[in-house]
From Swiss-Prot:
Disulfide pattern: none
Subcellular location: Secreted
Keyword Glycoprotein: yes
Taxonomic placement: Eukaryota, Fungi, Dikarya, Ascomycota, Pezizomycotina
Organism this protein belongs to: Aspergillus flavus (strain ATCC 200026 / FGSC A1120 / IAM 13836 / NRRL 3357 / JCM 12722 / SRRC 167)
Annotated catalytic residues: D225
Gene name linked to the record: bglI
Protein name, entry field: Probable beta-glucosidase I
Length: 839
């Protein structure tokens, strides 16, 4: 299709066509105007993989490590490669636009989507986001920076007003977007759900137009988050180009009326349309046909990149007495709830059906040359494990039948609309469609056969956005149709899990029937959350086992084992969009299990998987500790590569791990109170706070050990002569450092450059990260590395009185750190105070 002549096309569009172009037509597509050769564009989540157009029963995709995992790599080249693969995955899914990366800021360890953002520091987050976006857009696919801005909690996210000073807004929350834009002018930006200082961002002219467009000179498309548009005229006039998803709530006839009554000027309408048409031209080279089929790639080279990313993200937190790496020839006992669970991604928009997954037990087993034993230790599921994979159909397939009807189960002569075969007993129906379905109200019968392997009492659980009843051999075991209570699943729109139990016999086959009614059949009060169309369902089961029995068995085996590794942590049940965690603790029983295992085997290695910090009351007991995040498809292999030394760990923490939740600077100001949240810590987010008040965290930002040792030496600074005002170059400062691998194995060092300000007009952090680089070295190898920072970015704070950045005169300290304790120091001067605005 030929590129559009944008100005000529705008002249030829009718008002109705212009209005249509400013809103989606469904969950994932924009409007088309065939007579003018304007195609529909497809977009897809998301932050750690390209799901495609279907949450429900979709085409599998590559799942990358979560953003905090990628943040832990501190590797811009790796992020660039990952972006390129994401672009190729997007093309395979027929998608022109990727809804990511996410670059919000982890004010608190509890944020439900904290795992979706790279770091608590704007420089690290912004640079990584810029390089992953660059990789995406080099493939012709549009990247989307989100959520612009201050969408840093899930509690009342659509209604909460984030009250933040202009200084903190600029220095902390807008900074990652600003720095990412300097590397890659992303084609799209997605607004946040929340208000900032009294106005929803999607209709906040100061943020969208004055800062993003005018000050930063960005000219791409601004879209809303899903259902995150709250007005007609205000949003259009503020600069919101595209309301998502369709069908529109705020555009349509209301927008046409606003234009005809001069509430929205026609030239403003044309600006919104111009940005849509420019996006069409941006992705024109993809040549993706409308309604393109979705395909899977899953190539060997992609699997290798995913494995490399998983391994590079692992952070070696402790390694006393060189417990690690483990010996492949020795036997090993694998313990813990995350051992046989592939915690490959968080929940919500980040979730997808991965091509395949490798859990930690599988990763260890594949590499060990000795005997591998397993002990559960504890279970850590928030809801009961999915029952679907344990069911069989009548013809012996794993899974169950999924039969759709318009009529309630009580009605006779129901007409079968569609029958599917599913394996997962968790389904989000927001994008399930069938032309025979008459409305959002319909019913599904799911049937399968369950043959337990052990006698005992089995617990069954049902979570729904809608209504659900679960029957075993015709007996109602779980009824989740009445007196429903709000839970956290499905973006916070679901009920809590309702449970029932039944005693079952090993080897006996039972018929399981789950009857589901869609969201309109529910009486649940869902004010303040988004209910996505027909809703969703989840049913699970587990044999009831006493926790003490499980822990005691693990402890006994650990006391006798040659090598022990404990896998614990969180999963997508605990960290998910739509819900903030209540605390930092591991799931019930995990801490006790780890502590008791360490009591009998102090050399046991502990591996924690989570996207954000957790408490570790046993940390002083352990000699060897890894943090492994949500590692994508290859999480198990990546962890095993590090455990056995095939990969030397090089990850560094992108977020601070406090000793306890109360130590976090946002502790007294997190979650919405009467519709607002006060960002009371101001610019003292993360390490800035801990260093300012001299409070030691459990593990600091930037921490991470290696199996080798490094030295850093010969720091030199090269500065640029000052001019009366800052020019576009920003007056580069080049720091040169010699890095030497003084150990016996190859490894990667991350060199971090910090700037410490002199006394200025305002209180400032003790030091701030301003640059970094990663270098790979063989044993004994030495390399010179350069880190280039701009003086104006390295020295400035935002002056609210002048409404400009202030680079104050004075002597600024330069600190260079990395693995180990050594710090190189130097300094440079700013001779004259200067003020500036811009990107």
């Amino acid at each position: 299709m030929p590129r559009l002549d944008v100005e000529k096309t705008i002249e030829e569009l009718s008002l109705g066509e212009k209005v249509a172009l400013t809103a989606g037509i469904d969950f994932w597509h924009t409007a088309s105007v065939p007579r003018l050769n304007i195609p529909t564009l497809r977009m897809s989540d998301g932050p750690n993989g390209v799901r495609g157009t279907r949450f429900f029963n979709g085409v599998p995709a590559a799942c990358f490590p979560c953003a905090t995992a990628l943040g832990a790599t501190w590797d811009t080249e790796l992020l660039h490669e990952i972006g390129q693969l994401m672009g190729e995955e997007s093309i395979a899914k027929g998608s022109h636009i990727i809804l990511g990366p996410t670059i919000n800021t982890q004010r608190s360890p509890l944020g439900g989507r904290g795992f979706e953002s790279f770091a608590e520091d704007g420089v690290l987050s912004g640079l990584l986001a810029g390089y992953i976006s660059k990789g995406i857009q080099e493939k012709g696919v549009a990247a989307t920076l989100k959520h612009f801005v201050c969408n840093d909690q899930e509690h009342q996210r659509m209604a909460v007003d984030s009250i933040v000073t202009q200084r903190a807004l600029r220095e902390i929350y807008l900074l990652p977007f600003q720095l990412a834009m300097r590397i890659c002018r992303t084609a799209c930006v997605m607004t946040a759900y929340n208000k900032v200082n009294g106005t929803h961002v999607s209709q906040n002219k100061e943020i969208i137009t004055d800062i993003l467009r005018k000050e930063w000179g960005w000219d791409g498309l601004v879209m809303s988050d899903w259902f995150g548009t709250y007005s007609t005229s205000d949003a259009i006039n503020a600069g919101l180009d595209l309301e998502m998803p369709g069908k529109t709530r705020w555009r349509g006839t209301a927008l046409a009326h606003a234009v005809s009554s001069n509430e929205v000027a026609e030239f403003v309408m044309d600006e919104r349309v111009r940005n849509v048409l420019n996006l069409v031209n941006f992705v024109d080279g993809l040549n993706i046909p409308e309604n393109a089929p979705e395909k899977a790639l899953n190539r060997p080279q992609d699997q290798a990149l995913l494995r490399r990313a998983a391994a590079e993200s692992v952070v070696l937190m402790k390694n006393e007495e060189d417990i690690l790496p483990l010996k492949k020839e020795k036997s090993i006992l694998v313990i813990g709830p995350n051992s046989k669970v592939a915690a490959y991604c968080g929940g919500g928009s980040a979730s997808l059906d991965a091509y395949y997954t490798v859990n930690p037990f599988e990763g260890v087993s594949a590499q060990s040359k000795g005997e591998v034993k397993f002990s559960q230790g504890v279970y850590s599921h928030k809801d009961l494990p999915l029952l679907g994979p344990l069911l069989k159909t009548a013809d012996g397939k794993t899974g169950f039948s999924f039969k759709v009807y318009n009529e309630h189960p009580s009605e006779s002569n129901r007409e079968l609309i569609e029958q599917l075969h599913l394996v997962s007993s968790s389904g989000f129906l927001m994008d399930y469609v069938n032309p025979k379905i008459k409305s959002l109200t319909y019913y599904v019968d799911m049937e399968g056969l369950f043959t337990p392997e052990e006698d005992g009492v089995y617990d069954f659980g049902v979570t729904v956005v809608g209504t659900g009843q679960l029957f075993i051999d015709g007996e109602l075991v779980v009824d989740n149709t009445k007196n429903q209570r709000q839970g956290s699943a499905f973006f916070g729109s679901a009920t809590v899990e309702e449970k029932g139990s039944k005693e079952l016999k090993a080897g006996q086959t039972y018929k399981v029937l789950f009857q589901f009614g869609t969201a309109p059949t529910s009486d649940l009060d869902t004010r303040g959350v988004v209910v996505f169309g027909p809703g969703g369902f989840r049913f699970g089961a587990s044999r009831r086992v006493g926790q003490e029995e499980l822990i005691s068995n693990a402890v006994k085996l650990a006391s006798e084992a040659e090598q022990v590794v404990v896998f614990a942590g969180l999963t997508s049940e605990w960290e998910t969009e739509g819900y903030d965690r209540d605390h930092m603790d591991l799931p019930p029983g995990s801490d006790e299990m780890i502590s008791r295992v360490l009591d009998v085997n102090p050399n046991a290695v502990v591996v924690i998987q989570s996207g954000t910090p957790v408490t570790m009351p046993w940390a002083n007991k352990t000699k060897a500790l890894l943090h492994a995040w949500f590692g994508g498809n290859e999480c198990g292999n990546g962890i095993a590569d590090v455990l056995y030394g095939d990969v030397n760990p090089s990850g560094k923490l992108p977020i601070t791990f406090p000793v306890r939740l109360q130590d976090n600077p946002s502790y007294v100001n997190f979650r919405s109170e009467r519709g607002r949240v006060l960002y009371g810590e101001d610019v003292y987010v993360g390490y800035r706070y801990y260093e300012k008040v001299d409070l030691a965290p459990l593990f600091p930002f930037g921490h991470g050990l290696s199996y080798t040792t490094f030295t850093r030496s010969d720091l030199t600074l090269t500065t640029t002569p000052e001019k009366p005002q800052y020019e576009e170059s920003g007056e580069p400062i080049t720091a040169t450092v010699t890095v030497t691998n003084t150990g016996k194995v190859a490894g990667a060092e991350i060199v971090q450059l910090w700037v410490a300000p002199p006394a200025t007009e305002v209180n400032r952090p003790v030091r701030e990260l301003k640059g970094f680089t990663k270098v790979f070295l063989q044993p004994g190898e030495q390399k010179k590395v350069e880190i280039v920072v701009e003086k104006k970015l390295a020295t400035s704070w935002f002056d609210e009185m002048r409404e400009k950045w202030a680079s104050e005169k004075g002597e600024y300290g330069v600190l260079v750190t990395g693995t180990g304790e050594g710090v190189l120091k130097s300094s440079f001067k700013v001779e004259k105070t200067r003020y500036w605005l811009g990107l």
